[in-house]
Amino acid sequence: EGGVKVIDINTLGVLYVMNNTEKVTVSSFEDLRGKTVYCPAQNPTFLFKAVCEANGLKVGEDIVIDNTYAQPADLRTALASGMVDIAVLPEPMVTIAKSANASLSASIDLTKEWEKHYPENSLMQGCVVVRTQFLEQYPDTVKAFLNEYKASIEFVNANPTVQRRLDKFIGK
């Protein structure tokens, strides 16, 4: 039907509600009532809005979702510097923010909230796609890529020294 096909799902839920524990306490969605939560634009906002509403919070009335910092890296910086008190962030931004500011906490795991309210739908956050035409023309090449892709993931996971060197490139 479409021009691309998903050939691997590589990232499930990685989104968290984070808060500055010195300024605000957040342990449930009810704690977000009356608050402004900063959220990266697009998918994180759509997901967060759905989970807010599933938890009884009407966006625009009970809670404000602010997309001022549309990019996760910009929002991470704003949260870590204290310009923002509550934010939705993905990994690895969560870890980076926490390493910059010890007062930050990943207080709500949005994957767990999603699974609680939408158990029939997995929260996929990342995948590998291929153009359908390429897949049909070069199935052996795609299969070889997937085998190498899997082997590279297994190698990195089995070698913490390599992981640490790669972390420098992704900002951890």
What are the roles of these predicted feature ranges?
Residues 168-172:
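Acidic/histidine-enriched active-site and ligand-binding environments that engage anionic O-linkages
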Residues 68-167:
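Pocket-lining segment of extracytoplasmic ligand-binding domains
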Residues 1-68, 85-91, 107:
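Short, glycine-/small- and polar/acidic-enriched structural segments
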